[in-house]
């Protein structure tokens, strides 16, 4: 039994070794065949790539030649020594002056010195400028057109002022600084200035100081309703009185206004007041000239 077991062990070991050797041999054989095929495949691929490169190179040369052949007619401007000696088409050089430069420029853009898009871009850039200037000029003309119409409307305004054929000139006799004028003192001053109590319960200055003739100007109370009561003047007081005259009036309007101004100044002196203009401001020489100008305007308006 021991011998049989030993024999089986030896046979098994030999079988295992044989299998290992056979596996190593087959693996080496496959590797050697792979390495042998790889150089062949690489050479074949290199040849195919080289062949494809040659075909592409030939195509490129053809395209370059075609592009090089196209601008040959434009080489007539160059010197004969600059033309390449390889091309046989450089022989018809003496025949080049016959065709004009303008004719081929429309058919083939290679004959012209400038690219076709550059020549087309020029009119396109100038065309939009013209409508812009026209659009800008139109509103400018529209804005300036109505300008002369404004003074035409304002011109008739000064003509309406001389049309006044009558006016009222007013003077005020006022107490000082918020004071009041006593009724008795006022009555004495008014009577001494030639006024007479009359219509509308106010005082009037007639052409005749005695109270006869047309009325030249009148005197009223500064406080509404502007009337007086001569019987109660002792109990009466007022901040001031107003003297007014209509223009045109009887006689000379300038002399009547001068008389009215003198009467106002006399009453102011009697009652201790001051003479004010129609705006209740202190009388000034400039304001007197304004009164005289108003009188002249009314006289001129009535004379026409």
From Swiss-Prot:
Keyword Transmembrane annotated: yes
SUPFAM superfamilies, per the entry: Cell-division protein ZipA, C-terminal domain (SSF64383)
Topology feature Cytoplasmic, residues: 27-304
Source organism (scientific name): Erwinia tasmaniensis (strain DSM 17950 / CFBP 7177 / CIP 109463 / NCPPB 4357 / Et1/99)
Subunit composition and interactions: Interacts with FtsZ via their C-terminal domains.
UniProt xrefs under Gene3D superfamilies: ZipA, C-terminal FtsZ-binding domain (3.30.1400.10)
Family membership: Belongs to the ZipA family.
Protein name per UniProt: Cell division protein ZipA
Domain of life: Bacteria
Annotated segments matching region Disordered: 31-165
Chief location bin: membrane
